[in-house]
Amino acid sequence: MTEAEPLGRQVERSDLLDHAVRIGLVAYGVVHLLIGWLAVQLALGDHSEQASAQGAMAALAQQPFGEVLVWAVAVGLYLLVLWRLIEAAFGHRDAEGGNRVRKRLVSGAKAVVYLALAVTATRVAAGGGSGGGSSSEETLTAKLMDLPAGQWIVAAVGLAIIGYGGSYVWRGWTEKFGEHLETEGRLGWSGAGYMLLGQVGHIAKGLALALVGVLFTYAGVTHESGKSGGLDEALQTLLRQPFGPVMLIAIGAGIACFGLFCFARARHLDR
């Protein structure tokens, strides 16, 4: 055991980190509420903002005191990065052997996801992130395609995203997410409401992520980088299907439910 490990474990168990996580979850919830709202607006014919994290930040920045709000969201997301990094280094002590390693790797991967969102928020707050979106995913896909076996790398990324989305659907269907709420947060009418928000939200977010993965996989299989895209492109694709607006409104409302569940989790946090 290194000298830093006891200190790291103490920080991982601290009330201060609990407060940081709560702040971060509120920020994460705000992002999902905005994405859900933009998805519904897209279904209703408003294409002024992308239904993505970047579009959500841009929409928030346009509100009164918007720049301050986006900076606040960015700080919250960086706090989530810090939490997951600490968890990856010192957490999951109740698990043993390979299971502990797996859980710490998952925590590290989540830190990367939160970091990407935090950087997006920082760019928008600094005035440099209003564009991009799906075109950036297409550019990244094109660069990957140029690598040896790049076509299969892109397809593998797509399959990984599908798997990630599937994990959200599974957690929603089985109510596995309930373990992140303290007992009080699962009891009574309010607890039932929180669980319903979590179930709908996890399934909707999982389906949206899976659709992003399908686009990446299709781009890899067909060797067409333009077929890939981020969340906005995935929702645009859904919109073009039969009954697309109805399905998109349902997905948008579900993603908003995930945002509300993040607020509930912040209130009744059980790490």
Which residues does each predicted region cover?
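C-terminal functional regions that serve as terminal interaction/effector modules
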Residues: T2-G8, H19, G29-L38, W71, ...
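An N-terminus-focused feature that recognizes amino-terminal "leader" regions
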Residues: T2-Y78, N99, A266
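Cytoplasmic juxtamembrane regions at transmembrane-helix boundaries
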Residues: E3, E87-A109, G172-L197, A266-R271
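Membrane-interface helix-boundary signature
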Residues: V11-A27, Q63-L69, E96-V106, L147-I153, ...
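Hydrophobic, ordered structural segments
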Residues: D15-L16, L34, L38, P64-E175, ...
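Membrane-helix interface motif
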Residues: A39-A51, A121-E138, T217-S228
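Short, membrane-exposed interhelical loops at transmembrane-helix boundaries
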Residues: A51-A61, L140-L144, L187-S190, Y194, ...
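Hydrophobic alpha-helical transmembrane segments of integral membrane proteins
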Residues: L105-V124, S190-V212
